[in-house]
């Protein structure tokens, strides 16, 4: 069984948990207390010198960055390739959505909310505009689509639903974006492990109360 270093409230960690559920892989979950500096201990730095979560250790093979872990789990353990198809064009669209999630959507969350939550900084209206722009892009991608990349559930949906659910508990108004809202309601029903994702979201919500 693969060791999985994580925090339940972390959106990237939750995307891996849902992906593991989708491919039927059990994870040996190991809570890492970042506030206590457990990620900076020599034994963890040996595993991941970048000292980030999530981190997966599968039979001695260590990997971090959630979207890389998602793809690895599907390629190694998926019974089919439906979550990450081998077709170059289909895969390219999924990759684009994953990079969009990492570099634009989730990044906009981190840039706006983290300074307020962890450094008690005032809200930055310019950073909030970046969130709105990211949701406008996602809304456009989802025009006429039930899924984020193609016509069935993929790792792109799983990564995005982890991010979008985090925006929801932070109080962002997702319902303003009709296509995102429709996709999100469907994703809640069809994404394996959604319940555990939502439990993690509620744990994260305490930072916004």
Swiss-Prot record:
| Annotated ranges, domain GST N-terminal | 1-81
The record, for Pfam families, names:
GST_C, GST_N
Q: Which CDD domains match?
A: GST_C_Delta_Epsilon, GST_N_Delta_Epsilon
SUPFAM superfamilies per the UniProt record, alphabetical: GST C-terminal domain-like, Thioredoxin-like
Asked whether the UniProt record includes Transferase among its keywords, one would answer yes
Q: What is this protein's gene name?
A: GstD1
User: What's a BP term from Gene Ontology annotated to this protein?
Assistant: glutathione metabolic process
- What GO molecular-function term can you cite, just one? DDT-dehydrochlorinase activity
InterPro entries (UniProt xref): Glutathione-S-Trfase_C-like (IPR010987), Glutathione-S-Trfase_C_sf (IPR036282), Glutathione_S-Trfase_N (IPR004045), GST_C (IPR004046), Thioredoxin-like_sf (IPR036249)
Q: How does it assemble?
A: Homodimer.
Q: What does this protein do?
A: Conjugation of reduced glutathione to a wide number of exogenous and endogenous hydrophobic electrophiles.
UniProt keywords (A-Z) are: Transferase
Annotated residues for binding of glutathione: 51-53, 65-67
Q: What are the EC numbers? A: 2.5.1.18
Per its UniProt record, what PANTHER family does this chain match? Answer: GLUTATHIONE S TRANSFERASE D10, ISOFORM A-RELATED
* Enzyme class, broadest EC rank: transferase
The reaction(s) this protein catalyses: RX + glutathione = an S-substituted glutathione + a halide anion + H(+)
- Family of this protein: Belongs to the GST superfamily. Theta family.
This chain's protein is named Glutathione S-transferase 1-1
Specify the domain of life of the species encoding this protein.
Eukaryota
> Domain GST C-terminal, which positions?
87-209
